[in-house]
């Protein structure tokens, strides 16, 4: 049976997205929800696995780790890129590396939750509410304010659209800023 290790699944998200039971006839899965003590510990615990499903850049896939996993054939990372994977080492060892599609919506949503929380003093207001007080601060209005973005790719453009919906002036900077995208989104290049 093909052995698959799911690494660094601290939040148990792998089981929310994949029905591991459905795949259990062909694959044997083991979920590692805690970080490894060190690289030697990782080598010892991962020695029998043919595939590693890695969450983000939590466990570095170094040359030493890759070289010492003799059965390793595949590394699949969440998202399209993972800078913690030594691609030269995987290439030399003929380990196939691939990523998953990314869902761009959570990042702009979290970005706006944080912006709104800061603008409206959520932390202070929640703390005060627990002490019996109500509306102890005055937040700031976003309409008319300037929102600066670094990058106007898939995530940045979503953040920009929401900023425009709040009536904000949006500015963006990037080394490879696309002026057509700026015009399309009504964003000022910086």
Which residue ranges define each predicted feature?
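Phosphate-coordination loops involved in phosphoryl transfer and adenosine-cofactor binding
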Residues: 1, 72, 143-146
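N-terminal glycine-/charge-rich "phosphate-binding" loop or analogous flexible N-terminal tail
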Residues: 1-51, 55-56
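Cofactor-binding loop segments of dinucleotide-utilizing enzymes, especially the Rossmann-like FAD-
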Residues: 7-9, 34, 80, 152, ...
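Structural motif corresponding to alpha-helix initiation and N-cap regions
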Residues: 17, 36-40, 58-63, 84, ...
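Short loop/helix-cap segments at secondary-structure boundaries that form the rim of catalytic
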Residues: 17-23, 67, 85-92, 177-185
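Hydrophobic beta-strand scaffold residues
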Residues: 29, 96-97, 170, 189
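Phosphate/diphosphate ligand-binding glycine-rich loop within oxidoreductases
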Residues: 49-126, 130, 139-140
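Rossmann-like dinucleotide/phosphate-binding beta-alpha-beta segment
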Residues: 137-190
